Amino acid sequence: MEQNTYYFVGIKGTGMASLARILHDKGHQVLGSDIEKETFTQAPLLAAGIKILPFDPANLKPGMIVIQGNAFDDDHPEIKRAHELGLKILSYPEAVENEVKNHTSIGIAGAHGKTSTTALLSHVLAAVEPTSYLIGDGVGKGNADARFFVFEADEYRDHFLAYHPDYAIMTNVDFDHPDYFNDLADVRDSFETYGKQVQRAIFAWGDDPSLRDLNVDVPVYYYGTNPDDDFRAENIQRTPEGSTYDAYFRDQKLGTFTIHLYGEHSVLNSLAVLAVAYMEHMNMDEIQQELANFSGVKRRFSETDIADTTIIDDYAHHPSEIKATIDAARQKYPDREVIAVFQPHTYSRLAAYIDGFAESLSRADKTFVTPIFGSIRENAGNVSSADLEQRIDGSEGIDMDTMDKLLQYHNAVVVFMGAGDVEKYEEKYKELLK
């Protein structure tokens, strides 16, 4: 295999970090640039020996292949320099499509549940067959001889339209990016376009009306808990240890499966994984064992215990994700107080869903709201965290200087949620607890 030098502009991005590790695993030279601020994707890159540089056009050298992160436009100094040098430049989705096309590929799309489902499917398949995978939490593994390539297919700005996978999982369709899509129908149309590029089959959540009438060229198998779903979970038992259920494909029982994960969404995600494994004629006993072995994903219901407090870290940044995360906390800790600390992610998203956020956060026993985390594209807006607080009974604002407000809660489950840098609040709280 020809060895190349890949230069990533924005290498610390979650997808970019995953792809960098895949190309590195395959023996290519990999380096890249990003902001100096530390991120959770950084340590694994450095541990793999991948160099991370500050942005500087002088980093670019003849012969490099440049991978342009989604957050960076053509007027970025490094991208301009790459054009001047006549270097080959690939967008992140183009680079992913290049990697997946020589394998049996499964692209996981959906407004919510993409990363968790991608991680679960990657874990299960990799334990049974050589598998490459790209997960949206910065984890990636490359294997030149892989039978399968599992990857996250993000609908934001229609990035997933670069992909033509063998199989697609569609977890749900939701209006999650008001800065790009006009409405739910607009998002649904993008999913249908993606579906038309799938080569073999689609596995879609049966309860989502947007997915029920997809006009595509391959079979669509629905998964869920209803009698008319192709892949079904029945006799679901949810306990503080996880969930157990009987899985069926139409009239055929596939077995009884246990997952040590929480919330109804985790049952659905595991059912989608089963569907892929079944279609690829895999041994269900092995799949059963690997589902039970899976322990979770970074920033998806990640738990830490300090003294009598359980801290949960979760990427939830949309009302339905927050509802699912609080529901999962209540399943695992039915007798404890649940305290939510939420960092709104982008002004446009808070403005679009402020009532939904209020409704979901009201499921916690107490809610604290931090200042809004802006983005590269928007750092101001006509909405504030206080507007959200006013809609939630008994909620309060909190920031880095007032984290000691949380110390009044004992034997509680404190859930930190957000897609920005909510970890900084969490770390401050951990220091105070210690």
Swiss-Prot record:
<dbReference type="Pfam" id="PF02875">
    <property type="entry name" value="Mur_ligase_C"/>
</dbReference>
<comment type="similarity">
    <text>Belongs to the MurCDEF family.</text>
</comment>
<dbReference type="InterPro" id="IPR036565">
    <property type="entry name" value="Mur-like_cat_sf"/>
</dbReference>
<keyword id="KW-0133">Cell shape</keyword>
<dbReference type="GO" id="GO:0071555">
    <property type="term" value="P:cell wall organization"/>
</dbReference>
<keyword id="KW-0573">Peptidoglycan synthesis</keyword>
<dbReference type="InterPro" id="IPR000713">
    <property type="entry name" value="Mur_ligase_N"/>
</dbReference>
<dbReference type="Pfam" id="PF01225">
    <property type="entry name" value="Mur_ligase"/>
</dbReference>
<keyword id="KW-0961">Cell wall biogenesis/degradation</keyword>
<protein>
    <recommendedName>
        <fullName>UDP-N-acetylmuramate--L-alanine ligase</fullName>
        <ecNumber>6.3.2.8</ecNumber>
    </recommendedName>
</protein>
<dbReference type="Pfam" id="PF08245">
    <property type="entry name" value="Mur_ligase_M"/>
</dbReference>
<comment type="function">
    <text>Cell wall formation.</text>
</comment>
<feature type="binding site">
    <location>
        <begin position="110"/>
        <end position="116"/>
    </location>
    <ligand>
        <name>ATP</name>
    </ligand>
</feature>
<dbReference type="GO" id="GO:0005737">
    <property type="term" value="C:cytoplasm"/>
</dbReference>
<keyword id="KW-0132">Cell division</keyword>
<keyword id="KW-0963">Cytoplasm</keyword>
<dbReference type="InterPro" id="IPR050061">
    <property type="entry name" value="MurCDEF_pg_biosynth"/>
</dbReference>
<keyword id="KW-0436">Ligase</keyword>
<dbReference type="GO" id="GO:0008763">
    <property type="term" value="F:UDP-N-acetylmuramate-L-alanine ligase activity"/>
</dbReference>
<dbReference type="InterPro" id="IPR013221">
    <property type="entry name" value="Mur_ligase_cen"/>
</dbReference>
<comment type="pathway">
    <text>Cell wall biogenesis; peptidoglycan biosynthesis.</text>
</comment>
<keyword id="KW-0131">Cell cycle</keyword>
<dbReference type="GO" id="GO:0008360">
    <property type="term" value="P:regulation of cell shape"/>
</dbReference>
<dbReference type="GO" id="GO:0009252">
    <property type="term" value="P:peptidoglycan biosynthetic process"/>
</dbReference>
<dbReference type="InterPro" id="IPR036615">
    <property type="entry name" value="Mur_ligase_C_dom_sf"/>
</dbReference>
<dbReference type="GO" id="GO:0051301">
    <property type="term" value="P:cell division"/>
</dbReference>
<keyword id="KW-0067">ATP-binding</keyword>
<keyword id="KW-0547">Nucleotide-binding</keyword>
<dbReference type="InterPro" id="IPR005758">
    <property type="entry name" value="UDP-N-AcMur_Ala_ligase_MurC"/>
</dbReference>
<dbReference type="GO" id="GO:0005524">
    <property type="term" value="F:ATP binding"/>
</dbReference>
<dbReference type="InterPro" id="IPR004101">
    <property type="entry name" value="Mur_ligase_C"/>
</dbReference>
